[in-house]
């Protein structure tokens, strides 16, 4: 759903910013 999509995007952004990808 929309909420899951937003949460998934947030996790990707946090991953990229933290460099833990």
From Swiss-Prot:
Record keywords, A-Z: Amphibian defense peptide, Antibiotic, Antimicrobial, Disulfide bond, Secreted
Disulfide bonds: 15-21
Name of a matching Pfam family: Antimicrobial22
Main subcellular location of this protein, as a coarse class: secreted
Record flagged with keyword Nucleotide-binding: no
Lineage top rank: taxon: Eukaryota
Tissue: Expressed by the skin glands.
Localization terms from the record: Secreted
A Gene Ontology term for the protein's cellular component: extracellular region
UniProt key word NADP: no
GO biological process, one term: defense response to Gram-positive bacterium
Family membership: Belongs to the frog skin active peptide (FSAP) family. Brevinin subfamily.
Known function: Has antibacterial activity against the Gram-positive bacterium S.aureus ATCC 25923 (MIC=28 uM) and the Gram-negative bacterium E.coli ATCC 25726 (MIC=14 uM).
UniProt protein name: Nigrocin-2HSb
Organism: Odorrana hosii (Hose's rock frog)
Phylogenetic classification of the source organism: Eukaryota, Metazoa, Chordata, Craniata, Vertebrata
């Amino acid at each position: 759903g929309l909420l899951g999509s937003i949460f998934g995007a947030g996790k990707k952004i946090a991953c990229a910013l933290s460099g833990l990808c």
